Every structure is written in C-alpha cells, then in structure tokens.
Amino acid sequence: MHPQQLVVSWFSLVLLASPIVAMWELEKNVYVVELDWYPDAPGETVVLTCDTPEEDGITWTSDQSSEVLGSGKTLTIQVKEFGDAGQYTCHKGGEALSRSLLLLHKKEDGIWSTDILKDQKEPKAKSFLKCEAKDYSGHFTCWWLTAISTDLKFSVKSSRGSSDPRGVTCGAALLSAEKVSLEHREYNKYTVECQEGSACPAAEESLLIEVVVEAVHKLKYENYTSSFFIRDIIKPDPPKNLQLRPLKNSRQVEVSWEYPDTWSTPHSYFSLTFCVQVQGKNKREKKLFMDQTSAKVTCHKDANVRVQARDRYYSSFWSEWASVSCS
C-alpha cells in the first residue's frame, strides 16, 4: 500500500473510533445534550468529570434518582430522554464537590424542536421572534410569545455579521404586563431592548443583524434566530401634536401634526410620508397620502381624524394611528 493511502486509511479509522459527542456548555456547569428524538433512539454517551483534585472515594448521584449512580472521578451515562437529564453531583465523605446540569435539545426528522415559543405566523410561517425599530439609531426591540408561565428562562445574544459578535448589546428579557390573544388562547409576552454600539444611521447596511434567543423550560433547551436589516424593521412612532383648525367659509378643517420625537434627524434627510383618514362611527373615508404635515379634510360630527406615518424613501411599516376628535 502506498504510504499516502496508509495515512488516509489510518486517519479514517481514528475518525470512526472517535465519535463526536453532541454536548456543549451553555454556561458554567450547565450543558446541552443534542438528541435525535425518535422511538428506540440510542441517545448520546456523556462523560461527566468531577471538578476536584481528589481521585478516590468519589460517588455520583442525580436529582432524578436516589441511588448512587457510580464511583470515581468520571461518570459515563447514556442520555436518551428527559429522565436522563437533570443535575448530577459528585460527592466525597458526604460533601458535594461539584455539580453539572444537563439539558436536552431535541431534533425530530432533522428539525430542532420549537415547543417553548408560539409561532406568530406573521409576516411568514415560523415567525417566533418579532423585532421593530422606531428610527435608524441602532436601537430596536424584539418580542416573543409563550403559553408557559413557570420554570422558564431566556437569554438573548445579538451581532451584526460574524466579524463583530459584541457589536450589539441586548438587555435582559422582561415579562410584559400585556397578554396577547392569538387563536383563541392567551400568551405571555416577553420583550428585550437591543442597541448596536457603532450604528451609523445614514450608512447603507450590508451585514444583517442576527438575534438569538435561548430558551430553557425545565430541562428542555431551544434556540430561535431572527436576521434582519434595521431598515426592514422600521416602524415609526405615531405623529404627535395633532390639531384641528376650522377654515372660514368652508365645511373643511385643516388638520396638522408633527414628526414624532423618536424619529431620526435631520428630517430633511430622514423624511416621513403620511396617511390621513376621517373615521366615523360607521364609515371610513378614503385615505389621503402626502409628504407635508397638514391636510384639509371634511370633519363630520362624532368622527375622528387619524394620521399615521412611515419612511418616505423606504417601505417601512406604517406607524400606529394618532387621532383627534372632530367634535
């Protein structure tokens, strides 16, 4: 056999004899075991090591079992289901030396589980995370829904491209007081605020921002990802300071408004376009679209005039409506 062929054969043998363990560290002493989830799946062989210089007299227990699981500095276990996950502790002489928490990440038919968060199905299927920005400053808010209310933990990471993984900072996920009804069921809403450190509002974006939400429910781990440009998640705040001014010898009134305080400046560069509509009790008038901050409308008694805004040069989301009463 040619020497080069011998080296290749030996290398292949080493690969076959050294299976890759699908386990990684989520945080200190917390590990995620990735499992193919199907009937009679073999599971994953996991080796735990006691974090101690001691060598003798070490025993292992689990919070899932009252029995001693093994002895020695390492413990080898076969992880097949949630009953094999949980906290493993090594002891000596009645004293706990170190602990390791095992979480499971399920994969069924090649697809990672998405049991913890609710699919909001907008703007497309598998929309678990939604993000919005009020302007081009690099600050944005993301949120997600879940029916679960206990034993739940989230962490959020974000970056713009792989070259600067620390370029976007996200705070802690917060449970909103707002409940969201979807498909005849109520869901808890969690939000997180993020800020790009070196954002340049006027610059053309070339690298996507990526947001990753890691979710842990009891012993189940899942992660969810959303990628976007800031320009694609822009939703301005509603116009402010709506006012009506009667016009002499006319049934019409002039409605005026101002740019929202949160919108990027200068407004000559970051311009908005507006939609104006008169809304009565049983009827909505035709919408008027314009770039200026005033319009003439016929204002009926018991009706409202409402105005919304969006980016003039890029098709952002429309803002929520701001309204003023005609009466």
UniProtKB/Swiss-Prot annotation:
The keyword Glycoprotein applies. Heterodimer with IL12A; disulfide-linked. The heterodimer is known as interleukin IL-12. Heterodimer with IL23A; disulfide-linked. The heterodimer is known as interleukin IL-23. Also secreted as a monomer. Interacts with NBR1; this interaction promotes IL-12 secretion. It comes from Bos taurus. Disulfide bonds join C50-C90. Residues 23-106 form the Ig-like C2-type domain. Glycans are attached at N223. InterPro entries: FN3_dom, FN3_sf, Hematopoietin_rcpt_L_F3_CS, Ig-like_dom, Ig-like_dom_sf, Ig-like_fold, Ig_sub2, IL-12. This is Interleukin-12 subunit beta. Keywords: Cytokine, Disulfide bond, Glycoprotein, Immunoglobulin domain, Secreted, Signal. The lineage of its organism: Eukaryota, Metazoa, Chordata, Craniata, Vertebrata. It is found in: Secreted. Residues 238-327 form the Fibronectin type-III domain. Belongs to the IL-12B family. Residues 1-22 form the signal peptide. GO terms for cellular component: extracellular space; interleukin-12 complex; membrane. GO terms for molecular function: cytokine activity; cytokine receptor activity; interleukin-12 alpha subunit binding; interleukin-12 receptor binding. GO terms for biological process: interleukin-12-mediated signaling pathway; natural killer cell activation; positive regulation of activated T cell proliferation; positive regulation of type II interferon production; T-helper cell differentiation; type II interferon production. PROSITE patterns: FN3, HEMATOPO_REC_L_F3, IG_LIKE. Cytokine that can act as a growth factor for activated T and NK cells, enhance the lytic activity of NK/lymphokine-activated killer cells, and stimulate the production of IFN-gamma by resting PBMC. Associates with IL23A to form the IL-23 interleukin, a heterodimeric cytokine which functions in innate and adaptive immunity. IL-23 may constitute with IL-17 an acute response to infection in peripheral tissues. IL-23 binds to a heterodimeric receptor complex composed of IL12RB1 and IL23R, activates the Jak-Stat signaling cascade, stimulates memory rather than naive T-cells and promotes production of pro-inflammatory cytokines. IL-23 induces autoimmune inflammation and thus may be responsible for autoimmune inflammatory diseases and may be important for tumorigenesis.
